[in-house]
């Protein structure tokens, strides 16, 4: 296994000097010596199928490995059934877009503690993550790996140990270590 280096989203340098179109990012990343690109859906999955497929085609041609960051408003640690339903929808929409572009990993945040102990929040998140995995399998997204990301704030679920524990639930889960959050 080799280490890949890339960016999350489009940098100011890219948008100011190259293009505002994400489909152009893979060629630029290759030209500057990078080999990975995390497509950002933090504010919602707003990429259409045609654009996603073009990003994937361009990434394949440039030798760029793709991943996708799911919306920030996913809340694994919230027990409210309506919030769980929405979180499942956000993750499955992310997986759909990831499949369109040929990305095999979807990065997601665990959410806030919401005045719960870390253990209580983690147990809720584990149950909700199982429901998300079931929905992903039901909708044909077994080939997409979900990557819970480490979080940096004290009131957020997702320190390194918590992320590692979440990832013990299923082989379709691997940790996303954000070194800026450790």
Q: What kind of region is each of these model predictions?
A:
Residues 1-70, 74-93:
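N-terminal pre-domain/capping segments
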Residues 181:
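Positively charged, amphipathic and often flexible ligand-engagement surfaces
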Residues 61, 77-175:
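Active-site acidic/histidine proton-transfer and metal-coordination neighborhood
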Residues 178:
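Active-site glycine-centered loops adjacent to acidic/histidine catalytic or metal-binding residues
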């Amino acid at each position: 296994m080799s280490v890949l280096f890339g960016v999350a989203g489009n940098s100011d340098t890219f948008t100011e000097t190259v293009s505002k179109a994400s489909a152009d990012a893979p060629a630029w990343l290759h030209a500057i010596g990078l080999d990975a690109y995390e497509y950002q859906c933090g504010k919602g999955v707003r990429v259409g199928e045609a654009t996603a497929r073009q990003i994937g085609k361009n990434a394949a041609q440039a030798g760029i490995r793709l991943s996708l960051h799911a919306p920030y408003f996913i809340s694994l640690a919230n027990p409210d059934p309506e919030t769980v339903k929405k979180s499942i929808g956000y993750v499955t929409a992310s997986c759909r877009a990831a499949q369109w572009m040929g990305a095999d990993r979807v990065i997601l945040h665990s959410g806030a503690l919401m005045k719960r102990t870390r253990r209580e929040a983690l147990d809720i998140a584990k149950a909700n993550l199982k429901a998300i995995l079931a929905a992903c399998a039901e909708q044909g997204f077994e080939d997409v790996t979900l990557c819970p990301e480490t979080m940096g704030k004290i009131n957020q679920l997702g320190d390194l140990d918590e992320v590692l524990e979440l990832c013990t639930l299923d082989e379709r889960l691997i940790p996303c270590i954000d070194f800026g959050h450790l």
